[in-house]
Design a protein with these regions (language model features):
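Patatin-like phospholipase
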Residues: 1-174
């Protein structure tokens, strides 16, 4: 909550089987915990909690954004899907199905826009070498939708006013 643009980050407490929503604390730890996939990366210890990837319990936290910020409009991006039935010899997929809860990837048209990317079989969890491809795909998709987004999200704060607020924020930093 102390950032210029308030931020939320979702991780998972697998011991207590619940999501954790970070609104304060160490930003680096929160972001790192939110993408710590079990069996691939070690958990991040935050307080007494071993935190893992937030996608285990909430892979599309639009509900968190609605609850904490009551936004007029949400721009969502779906890059994964709920698990398919795993094959008998795919132990990792079986464990993933055991621990991951299904996510609701829906936004009402009046409250937002959802960008869907069907990447099944094309990009895997550890395909870090495809980051530029994914960035370019997301950028191109956003450009295709930008006119419809601008129609629904007019600028509500004049740019000069926003810049003054940014400068005041920067001056308040230690």
């Amino acid at each position: 909550d102390s950032l210029f643009v308030p931020f939320r980050c979702v991780a998972s407490d697998v011991y207590n089987k619940r999501e954790i929503v970070f609104s304060q604390g160490d930003l680096g730890d929160a972001v790192r915990a939110s993408m710590t996939f079990p069996l691939v990366f070690r958990p991040i210890k935050i307080g007494e909690v071993l935190a893992y990837d937030g996608g285990i319990y909430n892979n599309f936290p639009a509900d968190v954004m609605k609850r904490d910020f009551a936004p007029d409009y949400i721009i969502g991006s779906v890059v994964s899907s709920n698990n398919e039935q795993p094959e008998a010899d795919d132990i990792v997929a079986q464990i993933e199905s055991l621990i991951m809860q299904a996510s609701n990837y829906e936004l009402p048209d009046t409250n937002g826009i959802l960008m869907n990317f069907d990447l099944q079989g094309e990009v895997g969890l550890l395909d870090f070498d495809k980051a530029q491809y994914l960035f370019d795909l997301g950028y191109a998709t956003t450009l295709e939708l930008i006119d419809s987004i601008k129609k629904k999200v007019p600028r509500s704060v004049p740019l000069d006013s926003l810049n003054k607020r940014r400068e005041a924020y920067k001056e308040s930093l230690p």
